[in-house]
């Protein structure tokens, strides 16, 4: 009895273990699809692009060859097998298998268990259905499991394979006789895909033997690249490794040093470890020297944590000897190596091929001690240095540097989830919080790891409670890592770091330098130091500091005086600032205040003396300002005399403080203020660079600017009460930008503006009362730098004088200009010219040949100027609503093939009585033209008829589309918007991949049929379609179709009422790969979905990680924003009492009109993973769901295209 119980218990444990193992393995296949990036330089192999780190696979076979025996078996194949054998490569041999029409499970398994598939494409390859079915499975494996596919085109043209033409095509067509359309399309698609993989073409080799050697070498190289399973769970690691491998150039015998650069915590060490594990076996000796900075300062035998090198523990020479001893000991695995002089590394390693990774280098002396010169190492050696200091790499003349960037948002979420949940996706209910914590870590891998590990095992409520605290303080481990980088800075560089962290993160670099100029900081040098040490970046001219580094800086300042914020240098917390202001406890310690006004809960009452004691305040930034959040009942006594930056939008003051000095003022930004004027008298403004007072509706005058000799920007847009610009502006000799747009009270521009010899941009747009410009405006000696002049909307301006020939952009849209100066042809730098809505303009003189943008819309021009077709640089040409255009001049348009964007119409589509057509076509570059339909025949260039084209019709008038459309041989997309009178569609191009006839309510007939298997058809709300048209759409071989109908088409064998259908399979294993077509009848039922919950969408979104066909359906077009609904499909397999989810997809559909039933037909595919036990009855369950308040599924139908021997499919 006891023995029976033991046996029973053991059996139960085995069953449970097997169930958990299969469940886990299929869950991995569903969620964790991996990124397979080919690192080989050979063009003859290919693996598909994919997601993050792969699941480890054990390959049973090294190579699976697919070939047509009669072509290659006794000649080419035997030679290549001999070459494989010489290199130790063992291919799968199928000599024992009998070939027929179908492939048995054994061969399917052999294909799936082979690391490489090599397809030998010969003249008669396509004459064998066996070969074609092999190829389909190989291409599926390439897509699903990352199998590497290599091609050899043996005495056959790759183009014939791709297009199924020539002798190859004839053989293919014979094989297709009697086969279903689905099978033929599957074969054709596989041939096209495999032909797109660059491979070896035997016709291009003089000696076949040389090609065979090359193929065998490529196979050997792929087999040699075997990543360690230790790193399979690292998200996004492969792209890093691939790019670094390209820098390493391992096939070269040169000695090369490589730098891996990035800020602390970004994953440099992790990447280096993965790399070391993958390539170390290629070297005689290898060593990974971790955390060199600690070894250097504390000695090899004492590598405890060190926050800061407070004192020199050992002499410089001894520290270097210690480093060399550590390197040699780890390379040769000998702990007792003695190093007595600094030439030991060179002596011991110059004849050896070594791999050395020096991790965490932060001093040049460390490099000179361990790898001073490449001559120290033997041929083929590689030295890899990880550091956050770019200056160090430059100083050591290391030119091959890989900069590690932050992971993408989705990858960052996966990294966080690995540590928080032990898997790459969140638990149910945790998704929103997981995203918040990922954002809190700033997507920095160190932060993601620490926060995820901290939260692991906590309940949802504990997560919610932890979030507020972690938002305001750093975790200890994160702070310790980042703090080291801060501590080694000089005092001045530390100060700059804190300025940026608290005030200037995200600001323009040149602005920050101007704000801090003439201070105690060495700003230029400091920026270089912080940038070199990866503590900031200055890409795109903006200073960027990672959010965790920024939080470090804020924490450092907070600890300057815990509990007494008024004693700190910078104030950034809204509550602490509110307390200091409310209690009026400001001190001279405060240098800067950054207040996000929108975060103030109640109205903040400010006393008039609030700044009296802040004598050293230099930066006052009131951001995200809202009206009525700040109350200054008595105004302000003063502004700090050392103020450099004053940014205060919606300032409630109406009177400027009486005590004010602008001696240090660099930037004044006070948009939408209530002042009528600012300070009285003349202020010392030599440091002032920018003044922005836009939208100050009460402002009547600006202060005296005679001392503002360094002023660069004066922005006064929409100061609607401003009457004039003072004569003191003549002193602003460095003024580059003057914006007076929308100053409606401005009648005349002072001639003093002509002294602004540095002025580059002048905006006088929407100055509705501006009558004239100063007569002294022209001339190379006056305003010679002017490159941009905007006068659009200044409707009373009739003339303007000759202007500088340096002008690059001129906008006169909406002015009363009657003619353009004839000298315009001499403006050699003119690039953009807008004369639209110039109602008085009837003629136009020639413009310079270099112009790229020309807009003549809504003018009285009758003829397209003849010189237009000669503008070789013209890229944008617009003449919409030009009612007097004649057709004769339109013929010139057909010669303007170089114009990317062209728009020509006589009137609005609503009133023209003709349709507007948007044409997108591609030749050497993308083009987008908009014409009226009657212009197509006249205006279309010949190139359009042979180029890929998309057409979008906009109209309410026309009943049929123009005849010339039939001649567009490569028409890919066709859509209609507001085409309510369209009655019929003609036979269209076989290339058509998307037809959108949404809301064509009069459409009745469709001539011809659709031949592209990937086409997407949208006939939403086309309720007038006749029965013949409906049947044509439903029976078309298409990817997606949507049309009015209340029933599932008859050819869908498996049917069910509701939103789920089950297919019972015969007694055999589930298929490896499933392709099916589904049909769903959608209907409106208010009662069903009124309790629809948005959270349900979020849950389903989890299932789209594997298969996300979000773009699966063509929405109308660019002219309408159609509401969409989400429809999801989930496939489950049931066998032996187990339920395994294989995948899900999400489709976005335009929403039909209420109470109109529609049928949605779509094709989808899923990989079902590895085979299950073949003995038990199996079934597949297809669940569909509409994520919408008003819509549900009335009936569903299914048809299997890859037949897994389902009941009813025979």
Swiss-Prot record:
Enzyme class at the top of the EC tree: hydrolase
NB-ARC domain span: 241-511
GO terms, molecular function: ADP binding; ATP binding; ATP hydrolysis activity; NAD+ nucleosidase activity, cyclic ADP-ribose generating
TIR domain span: 59-223
Highest taxon of the lineage: Eukaryota
LRR repeats: 662-685, 686-709, 711-732, 756-780, 783-804, 805-828, 830-848, 849-873, 940-970
SMART domains: AAA, TIR
Enzyme nomenclature, EC number: 3.2.2.6
Keyword NAD among UniProt keywords: yes
PROSITE patterns on file: TIR
InterPro entries named among the record's database cross-references: AAA+_ATPase, Apaf_helical, Disease_R_plants, Leu-rich_rpt_3, LRR_dom_sf, NB-ARC, P-loop_NTPase, TIR_dom
A biological-process GO annotation: signal transduction
PANTHER family: ADP-RIBOSYL CYCLASE_CYCLIC ADP-RIBOSE HYDROLASE-RELATED, LEUCINE-RICH REPEAT-CONTAINING PROTEIN
Known role: TIR-NB-LRR receptor-like protein involved in plant defense. Acts as a trigger of hypersensitive response (HR). Functions as a guard of CAMTA3, a negative regulator of immunity, during pathogen infection.
Domains as described in the record: The TIR domain mediates NAD(+) hydrolase (NADase) activity. Self-association of TIR domains is required for NADase activity.
UniProt-recorded name of the protein: Disease resistance-like protein DSC2
Species in which this protein is naturally found: Arabidopsis thaliana (Mouse-ear cress)
């Amino acid at each position: 009895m006891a023995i029976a119980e033991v046996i029973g218990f053991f059996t139960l444990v085995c069953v449970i273990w097997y169930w958990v193992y299969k469940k886990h393995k299929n869950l991995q296949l569903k969620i964790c699809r991996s990124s397979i990036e080919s690192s080989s330089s050979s063009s003859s192999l290919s693996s598909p692009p994919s997601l993050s780190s792969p699941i480890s696979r054990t390959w049973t076979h090294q190579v699976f060859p697919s070939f047509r025996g009669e072509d290659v078996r006794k000649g080419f194949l035997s030679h290549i097998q001999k070459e494989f054998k010489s290199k130790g490569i063992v291919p799968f041999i199928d000599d024992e298998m009998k070939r027929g029409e179908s492939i048995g499970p054994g061969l399917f398994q052999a294909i799936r268990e082979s690391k490489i598939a090599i397809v030998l494409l010969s003249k008669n390859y396509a004459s064998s259905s066996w070969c074609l079915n092999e190829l389909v499975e190989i291409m599926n494996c390439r897509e699903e499991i990352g199998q590497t596919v290599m091609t050899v085109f043996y005495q056959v043209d790759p183009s014939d394979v791709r297009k199924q033409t020539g002798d190859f095509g004839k053989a293919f067509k014979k094989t297709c006789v009697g086969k279903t359309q689905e099978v033929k399309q599957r074969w054709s698609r596989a041939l096209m895909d495999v032909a797109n993989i660059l491979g070896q073409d035997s016709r291009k080799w003089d000696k076949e033997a040389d090609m065979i050697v090359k193929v065998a070498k490529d196979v050997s190289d792929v087999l040699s690249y075997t990543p360690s399973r230790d790193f399979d769970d690292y998200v996004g690691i492969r792209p890093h490794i691939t790019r670094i491998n390209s820098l390493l150039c391992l096939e070269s015998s040169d000695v090369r040093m490589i730098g891996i650069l990035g800020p602390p915590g970004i994953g440099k060490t992790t990447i280096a470890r993965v790399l070391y594990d993958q390539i170390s076996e290629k070297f005689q000796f290898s060593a990974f020297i971790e955390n060199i900075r600690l070894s250097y300062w504390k000695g090899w035998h004492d590598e405890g944590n060190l926050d800061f090198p407070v004192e020199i523990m050992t002499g410089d020479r001894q520290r270097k000897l210690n480093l060399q001893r550590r390197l040699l000991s780890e390379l040769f695995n000998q702990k007792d190596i003695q190093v007595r002089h600094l030439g030991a590394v060179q002596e011991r390693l110059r004849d050896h091929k070594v791999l050395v990774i020096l991790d965490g280098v932060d001093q040049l002396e460390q490099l000179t001690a361990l790898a001073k010169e490449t001559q120290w190492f033997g041929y083929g050696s590689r030295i890899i240095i990880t550091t956050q200091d770019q200056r160090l790499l430059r100083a050591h003349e290391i030119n091959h540097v890989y900069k590690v960037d932050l992971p993408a948002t989705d990858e960052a979420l996966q990294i966080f989830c690995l540590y928080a949940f032990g898997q790459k996706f969140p638990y149910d209910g945790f998704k929103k919080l997981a995203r918040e914590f990922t954002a809190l870590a700033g997507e920095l891998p160190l932060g993601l790891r620490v926060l995820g590990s901290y939260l692991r095992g906590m309940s949802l409520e504990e997560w919610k409670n932890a979030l507020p605290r972690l938002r305001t303080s750093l975790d200890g481990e994160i702070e310790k890592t980042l703090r080291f980088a801060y501590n080694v800075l000089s005092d001045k560089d530390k100060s700059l770091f804190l300025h940026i962290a608290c005030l200037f993160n995200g600001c323009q670099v040149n602005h920050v330098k101007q704000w801090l100029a003439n201070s105690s900081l060495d700003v230029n040098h400091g920026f270089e130091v912080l940038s070199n040490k990866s503590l900031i970046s200055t890409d795109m001219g903006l200073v960027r500091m990672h959010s965790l580094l920024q939080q470090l800086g804020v924490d450092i300042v907070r600890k300057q005086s815990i509990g007494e914020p008024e004693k700190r240098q910078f104030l950034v917390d809204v509550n602490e600032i509110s307390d200091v202001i409310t209690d009026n406890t400001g001190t001279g310690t405060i240098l800067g205040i950054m207040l996000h006004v929108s975060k103030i809960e109640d109205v903040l009452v400010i006393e008039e003396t609030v700044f009296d004691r802040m004598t050293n305040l230099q930066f006052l930034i009131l951001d995200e300002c809202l009206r009525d959040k700040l109350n200054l009942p008595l105004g302000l006594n003063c502004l700090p005399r050392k103020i450099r930056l004053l940014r205060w939008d919606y300032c409630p003051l109406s009177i400027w403080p009486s005590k004010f000095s602008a001696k240090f003022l660099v930037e004044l930004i006070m948009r939408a203020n209530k002042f009528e004027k600012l300070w009285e008298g003349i202020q010392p403004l030599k440091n002032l660079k920018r003044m922005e007072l836009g939208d100050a509706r009460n402002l009547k005058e600006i202060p005296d600017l005679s001392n503002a000799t360094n002023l660069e920007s004066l922005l006064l847009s929409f100061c609607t009460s401003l009457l004039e610009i003072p004569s003191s502006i003549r002193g602003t000799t460095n003024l580059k930008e003057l914006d007076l747009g929308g100053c409606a009270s401005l009648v005349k521009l002072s001639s003093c503006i002509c002294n602004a010899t540095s002025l580059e941009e002048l905006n006088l747009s929407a100055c509705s009362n501006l009558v004239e410009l100063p007569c002294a405006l022209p001339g190379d000696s006056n305003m010679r730098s002017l490159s941009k002049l905007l006068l659009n909307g200044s409707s009373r301006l009739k003339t303007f004088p000759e202007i500088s020939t340096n002008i690059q952009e001129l906008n006169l849209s909406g002015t009363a200009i009657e003619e353009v100066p004839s000298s315009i042809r001499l403006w050699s730098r003119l690039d953009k010219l807008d004369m639209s809505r110039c109602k008085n303009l009837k003629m136009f003189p020639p413009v310079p040949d270099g112009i790229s943008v020309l807009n003549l819309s809504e003018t009285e021009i009758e003829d397209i100027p003849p010189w237009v077709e000669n503008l070789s640089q013209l890229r944008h040409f617009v003449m919409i609503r030009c009612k007097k255009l004649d057709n004769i001049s339109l013929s010139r348009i057909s010669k303007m093939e170089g114009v990317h964007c062209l728009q020509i119409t006589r009137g609005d589509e609503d009133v023209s009585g003709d349709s507007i057509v948007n044409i997108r076509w591609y030749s050497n570059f993308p083009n987008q033209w908009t014409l009226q339909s009657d212009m197509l025949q006249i205006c279309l260039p010949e190139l359009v008829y042979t180029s890929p084209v998309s057409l979008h019709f906009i109209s309410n008038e026309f009943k049929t589309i123009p005849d010339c459309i039939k001649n567009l041989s490569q028409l890919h997309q066709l859509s209609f918007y507001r085409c309510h009178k369209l009655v019929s569609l003609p036979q269209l191009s076989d290339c058509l991949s998307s037809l959108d006839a949404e809301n064509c309510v009069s459409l009745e007939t469709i001539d011809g049929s659709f031949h592209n298997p990937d086409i997407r058809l949208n006939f939403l709300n086309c309720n007038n379609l006749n029965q013949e048209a409906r049947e044509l759409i439903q029976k078309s071989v298409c990817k997606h179709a949507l049309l009015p109908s209340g029933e599932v088409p008859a050819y869908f064998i498996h049917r069910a009422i509701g939103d789920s259908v089950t297919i019972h399979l015969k007694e055999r294993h589930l298929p490896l790969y499933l392709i099916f077509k589904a049909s769903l009848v959608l209907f409106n039922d208010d009662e069903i979905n009124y309790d629809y919950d948005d959270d349900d969408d979020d849950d389903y979104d989890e299932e789209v990680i594997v298969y996300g066909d979000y773009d699966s359906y063509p929405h109308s077009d660019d002219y309408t924003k159609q509401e969409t609904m989400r429809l999801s499909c989930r496939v489950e397999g049931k066998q032996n009492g187990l339920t395994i989810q294989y995948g899900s997809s999400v489709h976005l559909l335009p929403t039909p009109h209420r109470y109109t039933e529609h049928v949605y037909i779509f094709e989808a595919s899923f990989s079902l993973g590895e085979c299950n036990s073949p003995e038990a009855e199996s079934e597949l369950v297809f669940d569909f769901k509409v994520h919408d308040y008003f819509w549900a599924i009335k009936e569903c139908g299914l048809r299997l295209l890859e037949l897994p021997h389902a009941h009813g499919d025979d």
